[in-house]
């Protein structure tokens, strides 16, 4: 939030070099920094939670096992018999997004999933891997998906371009969905936090009025916790669906 009474809800998304002059030289901003932090957090969580495996698991081990089983079941049940092959990729995607969403809720942190460059990069990676999987499992036969079975020949000039556009739009819709949800949630949190600070500066009466935006901010934070995991889940399951289509014969 800027000085005075102005609420700068979009300032939180600005990129600035970190690590001083080294960061400026390397163009190293908060986004890659928090990506590294997120990766480290997930790796530590899994390493500490899974090693050594106790007969009676503790809370951390139970959480790690539940997380592993959840994503594994999601990949296998959605993709099918080849689900185990793509499980590591789906697992990495899910936890990279989840960690980014949740880290962004901490004070003085940065939400890298609120940047379209990041979400589009993830979506393009999913898109390319799904194409490579299509070629690997179906060969040139994957082109038949652009003309549904039983379609009259005279409809082909109309349906094929529509199917191609729909296929090419996947990374766009996948990236915008995550990006828009993260931006909207954090803007609302910043706005109501700004209202709270502004009202608190009005004296005793302002302190009373500040109760409402504080309550709203608490509710929004709880909602963001839910949205954070839901968006990671939606991205992961859509990835699984695209991969299922890619490996289907």
Curated annotation (Swiss-Prot):
The protein's matches in Pfam families, at most eight in alphabetical order, are given as:
ATP-synt_A
SUPFAM superfamilies registered for this protein in UniProt:
F1F0 ATP synthase subunit A
Annotated S-S bridges:
none
| Entry keyword Transmembrane | yes
Q: Which regions span the lipid bilayer?
A: 30-50, 86-106, 115-135, 146-166, 191-211, 218-238
Q: Which GO terms describe its cellular component?
A: plasma membrane; proton-transporting ATP synthase complex
Gene Ontology MF terms in the entry: proton-transporting ATP synthase activity, rotational mechanism
Which keywords are on file for this protein?
Answer: ATP synthesis, Cell inner membrane, Cell membrane, CF(0), Hydrogen ion transport, Ion transport, Membrane, Transmembrane, Transmembrane helix, Transport
Topology relative to the membrane: Multi-pass membrane protein
Location in the cell reads: Cell inner membrane
Query: Which PANTHER family does UniProt cross-reference here?
Result: ATP SYNTHASE SUBUNIT A
**Subunit:** F-type ATPases have 2 components, CF(1) - the catalytic core - and CF(0) - the membrane proton channel. CF(1) has five subunits: alpha(3), beta(3), gamma(1), delta(1), epsilon(1). CF(0) has three main subunits: a(1), b(2) and c(9-12). The alpha and beta chains form an alternating ring which encloses part of the gamma chain. CF(1) is attached to CF(0) by a central stalk formed by the gamma and epsilon chains, while a peripheral stalk is formed by the delta and b chains.
Family, according to the entry, reads as follows: Belongs to the ATPase A chain family.
Function, in words: Key component of the proton channel; it plays a direct role in the translocation of protons across the membrane.
Its name, as the record gives it, is ATP synthase subunit a
Protein source organism: Gluconobacter oxydans (strain 621H) (Gluconobacter suboxydans)
């Amino acid at each position: 939030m800027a000085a005075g009474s102005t609420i700068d809800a979009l300032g939180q998304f600005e990129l600035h070099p970190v690590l001083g002059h080294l960061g400026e030289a390397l163009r190293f901003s908060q986004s890659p920094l928090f990506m590294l932090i997120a990766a480290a957090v997930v790796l530590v969580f899994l390493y500490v939670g899974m090693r050594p495996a106790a007969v009676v698991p503790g809370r951390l081990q139970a959480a790690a096992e539940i997380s592993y089983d959840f994503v594994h079941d999601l990949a296998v049940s959605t993709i099918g018999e080849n689900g185990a092959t793509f499980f590591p990729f789906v697992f990495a995607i899910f936890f990279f997004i989840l960690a980014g969403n949740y880290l962004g809720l901490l004070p003085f942190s940065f939400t890298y999933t609120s940047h379209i460059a990041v979400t589009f990069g993830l979506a393009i990676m999913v898109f390319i891997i799904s194409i490579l999987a299509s070629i690997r499992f179906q060969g040139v036969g994957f082109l038949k998906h652009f003309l549904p079975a039983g379609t009259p020949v005279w409809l082909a000039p109309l349906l094929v371009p529509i199917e191609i556009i729909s296929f090419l739009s996947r990374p766009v819709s996948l990236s915008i969905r995550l990006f828009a949800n993260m931006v909207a949630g954090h803007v609302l949190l910043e706005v109501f936090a700004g209202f709270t600070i502004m009202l608190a500066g009005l004296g005793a009466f302002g302190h009373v009025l500040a109760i409402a935006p504080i309550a709203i901010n608490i509710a929004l934070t709880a909602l963001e916790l839910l949205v954070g995991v839901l968006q990671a889940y939606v991205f992961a399951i859509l990835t699984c669906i695209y991969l299922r289509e890619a490996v289907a014969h």
